[in-house]
């Protein structure tokens, strides 16, 4: 079972990592090509392209300029400890055991605009380059064109190695669009999380993001390897609703908080 998640805008490079174990990203050659494109952008270009403030644009211009592909624990950090958004709050990597981190290294992949596809312990430098960015490059008009089939082929390779060929998509639509579903060599499961509000069950972004992280954690900690086990997920008051589900979109409901 392979889990796909999105990265986070919020980063933490201040706290030291909880393990000295690390790996290197698989697609640094491609990342370098993107960095060269980004270095041609003035801070004002970055502000417009990424729809960010001048301050954040200046910070990212400096990050692009200082980026270099020799990653060590002195200048970089493992992705799973560097990302600090709602998904990662739900996943709570800081409290996983070394064995569970090892399992996550095998089963969890983080889609990234700059790095393509990251394992949890892959080292990264701080960056901001969202997958939906319309960055013109030698391969096309955006990052979906840039990554092309690369990420889908990488996912298929991992599915072959794992054997069960189940992909659990816990990523946002923006990031999952980088995967070519028709080329996926496995069964795609996209869990949906809905909270009760104003008389109906609906997807509430903040809660759904955190629930995605909690489900990823559940899969790792409980060593889930089947859909029958997956739908037993019940963290934080969520429960599986067969009535609201389809075969590819198991839906989990939660009453008003």
UniProtKB/Swiss-Prot annotation:
Entry-linked Pfam families: H2O2_YaaD
Cited InterPro entries: YaaA (IPR005583)
GO cellular component terms listed in the entry, alphabetical order: cytosol
Signal peptide: none
GO BP term, pick one: response to hydroperoxide
Transmembrane segments: none
Similarity section: Belongs to the UPF0246 family.
HAMAP family: UPF0246
Name of the protein described by the UniProt record: UPF0246 protein Sputw3181_3112
Organism: Shewanella sp. (strain W3-18-1)
